[in-house]
Regions:
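N-terminal non-catalytic structural scaffold regions of very large proteins
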Residues: 4, 9-425, 437, 449
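Membrane-bilayer interface helices and TM-boundary transition segments
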Residues: 426-448
Length: 449
């Protein structure tokens, strides 16, 4: 009887009732912080804001003839079907159903159909900051990545110093400028072949004539040499030439090229500096662009080039950045990593929705019949099951579990993988990344991480 009574008392004793009692004579100087708040808060933020943003980015999905339009509204989570204990015992995933308001609008008739659509079961975080996937406890490790922004670097190439500028977005195409060994200003869009940066400026319509370019960037030797090599003299020539480099094999047209560049650099759905990126760009280049503008602007590009030219000319006050400094890095926590994966699933689902819009009978269509949740479910399952950052929780003792939840990793998608320069062989990580940097002091434990 005593045994069974103990059991009952145990199950009623929940994690929230635990009180920390100190038996020391000297009072504790500081209250112990919640050490797994990194994980918990991030996932809570994702459940609310992260999902809302992902749905907002995908709305509206339009049919090819622009008659039908699907938009996503508010979302909510149902209750998990099983408790954490049941999931552990029966090798199940601890998850809750995700439901979303979906509205289907027929623009011709003005008819609107609304439904609460089931978007699949979503793994939930336990109070301990872990996930239970098929009965095993897993942890999503936070990822250390380069912060979006603009970076300057230099390297030696056949005895000459080369200066580079990179505009790195949170999501989208990289833009790299460099003053090469022939002292010309070059640009590489989305890591494709290098081309003249003045041609790029013409194509964007920032500066079209040679005089415009000299007025914008000054009359240095670098600019003179670049203009001599630049074959395109009008905006149309420049657009066609750039399209040839970006999409070799396709017939180049001015309109196709213009929409390609617009889409790559100025479309918020495909290019996002994020607020941290906008802040870093403004700070580095002394700009005053609004924080809400998270795509590139003409000023960003011009200011980046001006700084690069001053740096290459060796002017005072212009210096290259240290990539390994923590000021140039940021942490992607669980919430952001899961949100990115959810976005991938959503974009795959969009294709299915468009196909179904064109194939189904317009009068019969309902939001439920259009939406196929398989891509989303598969994408989330893939992340928790096989991503480099979703790891089997270290359960040697309570402390190893805690340190595992607070660990940082530079690997994983969007982090470092197979680098060209000096790398430690086993994981292809550049040795410089593994070095202890003075900015780590009092921020990151060099041993546990």
């Amino acid at each position: 009887l005593v045994g069974s009574e103990m059991c009952i008392r145990d199950s009623a004793y929940t994690a929230t009732e635990r009180k920390r009692v100190s038996f020391g004579k000297i009072p504790e100087a500081m209250e112990l912080p919640n050490l797994i708040s990194v994980q918990r808060e991030s996932f809570e933020r994702f459940k609310d804001e992260g999902l809302r943003e992902a749905f907002k980015e995908s709305s509206p999905i339009q049919s090819q003839n622009h008659v039908l339009e699907v938009t996503f509204g508010e979302h909510q989570f149902g209750d998990p079907a099983h408790t954490v204990e049941e999931c552990r015992e029966k090798d199940m995933t601890y998850q809750a159903p995700l439901l979303t308001d979906v509205r289907l609008t027929n623009k011709e008739t003005g008819e609107i159909k609304e439904q609460l659509v089931f978007m699949g079961d979503f793994p939930m975080m336990t109070d301990q900051g872990t996930f239970i996937i098929n009965g095993t406890e897993r942890i999503v490790v936070s990822q250390l990545v380069r912060s979006p922004g603009v970076y300057y670097s230099s390297e030696m190439d056949s005895g000459k110093q080369i200066y580079k500028a990179q505009i790195i977005p949170s999501r989208g195409a990289w833009l790299e400028f460099e003053v090469d060994k022939r002292d010309q200003l070059m640009v590489s869009i989305d890591r494709k072949r290098k081309q003249s940066a003045t041609m790029f400026l013409r194509a964007l319509g920032i500066a079209v004539t040679n005089d415009d370019i000299i007025e914008l960037l000054g009359n240095s030797d670098v600019i003179k040499r670049t203009l001599e090599r630049d074959t395109a003299l009008t905006r149309e020539d420049a657009l066609i030439e750039i399209y040839r480099r970006l999409r070799p094999g396709e017939p180049p047209t001015v309109d196709a090229s213009r929409s390609l560049l617009e889409g790559l650099l100025f479309n918020p759905q495909r290019y996002d500096l994020a607020r941290v990126g906008r802040y870093k760009v403004n700070k580095k280049l002394n700009l005053t662009t609004e924080e809400e503008v998270t795509v590139l602007t003409d000023e960003d590009i011009v200011a980046t080039l001006r700084y690069l030219l001053s740096l290459a000319a060796g002017e005072q006050g212009f210096k290259v950045d240290d990539i390994d400094h923590f000021g140039n890095r940021r942490i992607r926590t669980v919430g952001e990593l899961v949100a990115n994966q959810f976005r991938i699933g959503m974009s795959r689902m969009e294709r299915v929705v468009r196909e179904r819009m064109s194939s189904q009978d317009i009068d019969e269509i309902t939001p439920q019949s259009l939406i196929n949740i398989r891509p989303i479910v598969a994408s989330i399952k893939e992340f928790f099951g096989s991503s480099q950052l979703s790891q089997f929780m270290d359960q040697a003792n309570p402390l190893t579990g805690l340190t595992h939840k607070r660990r940082l990793s530079a690997l994983g998608p969007g982090g470092l993988a197979g680098h060209k320069s000096g790398s430690s062989r086993r994981t292809n990580v550049p040795t410089a990344v593994r070095d202890v940097h003075n900015s780590h002091y009092s921020r990151m434990c060099p041993i546990e991480t």
